[in-house]
């Protein structure tokens, strides 16, 4: 099992990391990594309601990193574009013979980097929540 944390930006540098656990300390460390890779960008992060995401320390850390958090309603992963990336990665893994944990992590890392460069996973989200004008700006129009 590979416990992966991922950041899929609309504009910015995607970040993926593997953690032993999914505790609030791990969440805070990941927030710092996101900020390190995106030092000047405004960061708005969409999260589910996992307990470590909503912990006071996690929220405090996000504020210190200048990251705005948006928590999704319960049972609504379809509102988070990164879930479509995870689903696509799981599809690849399901057709791959995995030699060991390092091999699994390498596949996840490579596919995440590949897929996170595509805005297609966020197309409908961008249009629905940010508007068509923002989408056209991202595309250079």
What are these regions (language model features)?
Residues 43-44, 68:
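The start of beta-strands in P-loop NTPase/AAA+ ATPase cores
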Residues 64-81, 98:
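RNase H-like polynucleotidyl transferase catalytic core
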Residues 34-38, 61, 111:
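Hydrophobic helix-cap positions at the C-terminus of alpha-helices
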Residues 1-41:
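Electropositive, glycine- and tryptophan-enriched low-complexity nucleic-acid-binding patches
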């Amino acid at each position: 099992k590979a416990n992966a944390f991922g950041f899929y930006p609309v504009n910015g540098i995607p970040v993926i990391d593997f953690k032993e656990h999914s505790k609030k300390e791990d969440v805070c460390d990941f927030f710092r990594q996101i900020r390190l890779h995106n030092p000047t960008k405004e960061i708005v992060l969409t999260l589910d309601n996992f307990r470590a995401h909503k912990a006071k320390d996690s929220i405090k850390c996000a504020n210190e990193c200048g990251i705005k958090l948006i928590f999704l309603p319960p049972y609504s992963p379809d509102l988070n574009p990164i879930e479509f990336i995870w689903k696509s990665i799981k599809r690849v893994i399901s057709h791959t013979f995995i030699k060991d944990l390092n091999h699994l992590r390498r596949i996840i890392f490579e596919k995440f980097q590949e897929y996170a460069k595509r805005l297609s996973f966020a197309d409908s989200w961008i249009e629905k929540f940010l508007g068509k004008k923002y989408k056209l700006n991202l595309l250079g129009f």
